[in-house]
Amino acid sequence: MFMKSIVEEALARAEREKKERIEGRGFEDVEDEILQVLHELKTVIKVIGVGGGGCNTITRMYEEGIEGAELIALNTDVQHLYYTKANRRILIGKRRTRGLGAGSLPQVGEEAARESEDEIKKLVEGSDMVFVTCGLGGGTGTGAAPVVAEAAQEAGALTIAVVTFPFSAEGAVRRANAEAGLERLREVADTVIVIPNDRLLEVVPNYPMQLAFKVADEILMRAVKGITELITKPALINLDFADVRTVMEKGGVAMIGLGEASGEDKAAESVRKALKSPLLDVDVSGAKAALVNVTGGPDMTIEEAESVIEEIYSKVDPDARIIWGAMIDPELENTMRTLIIVTGVKSPQILGRKGYPVTRKYGIDFVR
């Protein structure tokens, strides 16, 4: 009976606190000093979409809403930029491209970014974490994203690139440009999360390619939102910025797995789906680190969240560093989602059968 009354009191208190948060009460008497310290401790996170693909992803993120992150769109194509939804929109390389785009030439994209380098450096100044997102293979994203990532690194920010790798159907030139762009990003970003578009065809087979691009935007959005809101949003189990930095700093190439399940065995099923996700085209047993976001409805228990992590621990290297957080989403009644980002992986599909392309910083010409 004693334990029952404790549980009932805890549940009642949780309900009161929830109501106070919704009504905006309960903080009037917090001292100014505490508010000031909280403000100073706030992690400054910026998400920068570069080029057409990157700007499309920023629009999707803006529509979804990512708590605690500023969304910024960079492009050489003024018309595309005009229709992009973002907190800030910046036209780069005005003299080089006159707002007409990079013509699918990464060298032009890089030159445009170099022209606007001072503006880019001011953009990332004071940031703790910068996400750089783009579709590799085109002109602006492939050429300019490494310049943005380099500026973020020099500003001292944890720099995470989240990119798509082109469909085989897009042609050999685009894929060769993507490989060169990926190598440059690896040299200037802490971690590069790669979404291989070819694998999306297993997720949405027999659908138009345009839909596959929309799916890619959704996955990129979930990756950034999943990492960011574990830091910025109150959660069942929170992570702080130092936790994320531990796993993502110098993480190398990373891949992402997503799983969702409902019903009695939802915890185990969601993690199984995440680990078997077509996007996670690697042997996770050799991964050196992983970041996991477990999201469930109000009915999710700590035990369910922990069982997800136990399952992941059983699949990876015993010495791998795993950090995880758990969040509640009121819309996920009787459903759980697992997002896993595995760092330090090598994927032949992404980097060629012989391993990493042999390139050096700014020492390779993009294929025209």
UniProtKB/Swiss-Prot annotation:
<dbReference type="GO" id="GO:0043093">
    <property type="term" value="P:FtsZ-dependent cytokinesis"/>
</dbReference>
<protein>
    <recommendedName>
        <fullName>Cell division protein FtsZ 1</fullName>
    </recommendedName>
</protein>
<keyword id="KW-0963">Cytoplasm</keyword>
<dbReference type="GO" id="GO:0051258">
    <property type="term" value="P:protein polymerization"/>
</dbReference>
<feature type="binding site">
    <location>
        <position position="217"/>
    </location>
    <ligand>
        <name>GTP</name>
    </ligand>
</feature>
<dbReference type="GO" id="GO:0005737">
    <property type="term" value="C:cytoplasm"/>
</dbReference>
<dbReference type="InterPro" id="IPR018316">
    <property type="entry name" value="Tubulin/FtsZ_2-layer-sand-dom"/>
</dbReference>
<keyword id="KW-0717">Septation</keyword>
<dbReference type="GO" id="GO:0032153">
    <property type="term" value="C:cell division site"/>
</dbReference>
<dbReference type="Pfam" id="PF12327">
    <property type="entry name" value="FtsZ_C"/>
</dbReference>
<keyword id="KW-0342">GTP-binding</keyword>
<dbReference type="InterPro" id="IPR008280">
    <property type="entry name" value="Tub_FtsZ_C"/>
</dbReference>
<feature type="binding site">
    <location>
        <position position="174"/>
    </location>
    <ligand>
        <name>GTP</name>
    </ligand>
</feature>
<feature type="binding site">
    <location>
        <begin position="139"/>
        <end position="141"/>
    </location>
    <ligand>
        <name>GTP</name>
    </ligand>
</feature>
<dbReference type="Pfam" id="PF00091">
    <property type="entry name" value="Tubulin"/>
</dbReference>
<keyword id="KW-0547">Nucleotide-binding</keyword>
<dbReference type="GO" id="GO:0003924">
    <property type="term" value="F:GTPase activity"/>
</dbReference>
<dbReference type="InterPro" id="IPR045061">
    <property type="entry name" value="FtsZ/CetZ"/>
</dbReference>
<dbReference type="GO" id="GO:0005525">
    <property type="term" value="F:GTP binding"/>
</dbReference>
<feature type="binding site">
    <location>
        <position position="170"/>
    </location>
    <ligand>
        <name>GTP</name>
    </ligand>
</feature>
<keyword id="KW-0132">Cell division</keyword>
<dbReference type="InterPro" id="IPR024757">
    <property type="entry name" value="FtsZ_C"/>
</dbReference>
<comment type="function">
    <text>Essential cell division protein that forms a contractile ring structure (Z ring) at the future cell division site. The regulation of the ring assembly controls the timing and the location of cell division. One of the functions of the FtsZ ring is to recruit other cell division proteins to the septum to produce a new cell wall between the dividing cells. Binds GTP and shows GTPase activity.</text>
</comment>
<keyword id="KW-0131">Cell cycle</keyword>
<dbReference type="InterPro" id="IPR003008">
    <property type="entry name" value="Tubulin_FtsZ_GTPase"/>
</dbReference>
<dbReference type="InterPro" id="IPR000158">
    <property type="entry name" value="Cell_div_FtsZ"/>
</dbReference>
<feature type="binding site">
    <location>
        <begin position="52"/>
        <end position="56"/>
    </location>
    <ligand>
        <name>GTP</name>
    </ligand>
</feature>
<dbReference type="InterPro" id="IPR020805">
    <property type="entry name" value="Cell_div_FtsZ_CS"/>
</dbReference>
<comment type="subunit">
    <text>Homodimer. Polymerizes to form a dynamic ring structure in a strictly GTP-dependent manner. Interacts directly with several other division proteins.</text>
</comment>
<dbReference type="InterPro" id="IPR036525">
    <property type="entry name" value="Tubulin/FtsZ_GTPase_sf"/>
</dbReference>
<comment type="similarity">
    <text>Belongs to the FtsZ family.</text>
</comment>
